[in-house]
């Protein structure tokens, strides 16, 4: 308990820190069991409250400590590395997962106690951060670089990443694997943002009666969705019209997928598109073939590799 509200801190497993993404995914399979287990519901409500607190500390951070404990990543070159942060890699999905968790919790329990004034303030910060990382008004306030011998652990151009053209998509400096993006517009994470913003709009409209903010969320979701359709797809010479993994808005595309969620493969699972969607089906064929540089096939099996494991 903290301030008379449930409070739950869930470590990622091998590190005594909480990732917004990991903690959401770790409890996701248990959500249907809440109806028969009040203690479990209390635990998950506590996690949602803690995620709210984390976002209010820093919406750009991906991993948090259980208090102002500091981190071995304190030497990273970034703007706001306070003691409560374990790591400060900007990943769009870090802000989508808490919305997804809160939405599903609410859908299953009808409990609105998690939707406090702080939760609403955190969501305003989420939308503000997404808009800043559309980079329509310049490169924004976030950069990240690390002194390391692993290039994918740091961003180029003094931490700002490769240039992007502001076309309505949202920059993600890092992927869900915590590896740096090559081109800033990570399409699977932008897909996730579209779904999350629409869920957020429903909550803000139904629970808070914040009509204007709900409309703002929908408008942003529609803008990002339209940009995905226009700039996040391309004609592959073998597979036809497919979704790109990353783009920069200038016409450059990265053709691959990563074994994580969000990924291109997981788009229907996250609710972005139908499994039968023609572009998705073409993309799926590409991903499960040697046209994907991170597809493997051997005598014992086949699958999708993650860059972090190569």
Describe every region a protein language model picked out.
Residues 164-199, 244-253:
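Acidic/Ser/Thr-rich, low-complexity mid-to-C-terminal regulatory regions of eukaryotic proteins
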Residues 308-310:
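Conserved small/polar residues in nucleotide/adenosyl-binding loops
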Residues 58, 62, 131-148, 185, ...:
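Catalytic cores of carbohydrate-active enzymes
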Residues 1-4, 43-62, 121-138, 165-167, ...:
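Long, well-ordered core segments of solenoidal/helical folds
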Residues 1-21:
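Low-complexity, Ser/Thr/Pro/Gly-enriched N-terminal "stalk/linker" regions
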Residues 1-6, 69-78, 163-175:
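Active-site-adjacent bridging/hinge elements
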Residues 16-44, 48-152:
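Aromatic-rich carbohydrate-recognition surfaces in CAZymes
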Residues 25-38, 97-112, 191-210, 265-276:
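Well-ordered alpha-helical scaffold segments within catalytic/enzyme domains
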